[in-house]
Amino acid sequence: GTGSDLWMDAMESEERGDRLSTLRICKELVSEEPDNADAWMTIARMELPAPAKGKQEMPTLVQTAKSVTALKKVVQLDPENRRAWDLGGTLLVDHLGMMEDALIWWEERRGHAPAEVTPLIEQVSILVRMGYYEECADLIEEMFSPEMESVDGGLRMRMGRVSQTVSKASKMEEDEIFRPNQPKHPRWDIIERLKKKKPISQGLFLMLFVAPLAFFIGSASMIFIGNSGWALPLVFIILLVAVMAISRLSMNLLQSINRHALDLERAIDYETTTGQVCIPNSIRESPLYSSLMKGKMPAIRERVALIVESDEKIPVKWDLSIPMLHD
């Protein structure tokens, strides 16, 4: 039939590397067979820039939105398509910054795969960014529960990392959690004061802080141990342990040094989630803000520009809608 002919044509044009024709053929195909999940998945892939070996071109706002629309079709027709779930989650969070939509997206995935840990990891990562720590704790408990399917090393590491992130962040904010939608929140004054200070990168921090300390420990242990035959391997081991310990301890220090930047990151997340603004103009014109925006995906930068243009304020009473709580 025409459907299978079109699908063959689409496959051939994709093999030739002709993404536009592939997209055109698949669009024609889904207008004839709206339930063709493979064709929708191909549309979702073709709407995005071609995967590159070197520097990857990132999708624009329009490309991202079109791809997400197609992916919503895919997961509706073929909920077992893991790749579609993962891609949709990445686009919603990293390229659109739509945290509420992403929470719902992963909640739907949980409906189809209740024993899978990935959706929980993703939901926890979103809730941490938005500052909802109590909800994180419940999900983490669920994530490590015996009902969940067994996971491989990579996922086990991600689970450990995400729960560490939660405990670090909630410790840092134990005095008060920053809610950017409250214009009178005391953290805004601190961001205003530090708005010329860009965040310190981990690499620079390790070089300025950890390296000199390690050098000091190394020299000191050489003096104490002397230069017998086994001195060098011993000093090396002391150094290694010292560097690892200092790096771990100093990451908390780095986090508190960069707290104003983490706060402003959250304010940007609030803006992209609500489509409304909460960042004062004096801060939006600052070196801190532009250094954070440089690290964002192009689609997010486009969205923020549109949100700033429409200039609607986030209501002070706004609260993140969390699907898990409305079950």
Residue locations for each model-derived region?
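TPR alpha-solenoid repeat register
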Residues: 39, 84, 119, 152-155
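Alpha-helical segment of the N-proximal tetratricopeptide repeat
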Residues: 1-35, 42, 48-59
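Canonical positions in the second alpha-helix
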Residues: 28-29, 73-74, 108-109, 142-143
